[in-house]
Amino acid sequence: MKVYYLNRERFSKGDTKIAFEFAKKLILENPNLNILTFLVYQQRQYESFLSEMGFTKQHYKYHGFVAKNGVRIQIHTIKTYNPDYQFVGSPQHEVLIAVGVPPKELEKYEDKSDIYACIVIPWLLDENLSFLNLHEAINIETNELITTNYNIDQRVVNAINWLKATS
């Protein structure tokens, strides 16, 4: 899973639109991607999110809709989201936009083969830095890798490289 992020100290209105535009670009570049999922932490976050993105209560009720280009757009909380669910047809390849989802919740999805990319929009950037550094996240506005501000012990780096080589 590729990890992207929006480099903001705090979540602000309009961040979801920026991530949505980036996700649309990813989907246009890769014809195998057919699902775009917005993942929020709690249900009450839906109301402001839906109005900001122009979605209606019907979209909330059915957890999404199918866009004109055939891409299914889903809206879920961490309790209703199931990346293992398969739609009829081609294999599912998904772009996940995680809005204010804590790193411990994101870790549950990092090994799911159906998720092509995860775009992280943190409530607070500091809270997600360890997850973003670990996954070598790319800033969606500058296309640059996140810069780490700590050193990893060389033994750990060697162990990671060994695991990559033998996997």
Task: Briefly describe each language-model feature range.
Residues M1-S167:
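Short, flexible loop motifs at catalytic/binding sites
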